């Protein structure tokens, strides 16, 4: 690719994915954010959004197939489990652990973006890498990759109950334990209108049980609810 040093990408493929890409451009494109193309229009022409589109479909199929063949729960439960496995936080965390963050080509502005924005970039790149593996090696290898880095999270998700809608789950717990309904309050609101960051607290009675931060009040509420659920679980409640 235009004289760039591709060795780190092949090293990553060999060490983290377990094989070398015959078409290394696929992997490099999977790790190229749209913003980088915008800054280098003369030399770079492809970003990872098409591969992300493909990888998203492969990821959903592989997870769906695994859940269908290994569990007998009804559709609604399996759908909730799948959603927990493939949500941004889950696949972004998988990407972070794989360690390809430094290899992602992005603009200077994106490099200095919020933690949430960085997590989204990692998650999108993870799906794009799945798409690249699918095109390079086929569905079986893509599925093996997904099992190794995503399906492995399932036991923890089931044990923690994080597959449930966190706000509904918290309300069940708080009403059972404290006979009270959680109340969500905005603690702070920062940033320009196009890049807001909300911090919310969830209160049960006069006690703040959890805090959450997110780009919207809804996301922050969900994070706060998860924190409150974890606090209840630490005290032995389920």
Model-derived regions: residue spans:
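Double-stranded RNA-binding/processing signature
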Residues: 1-238
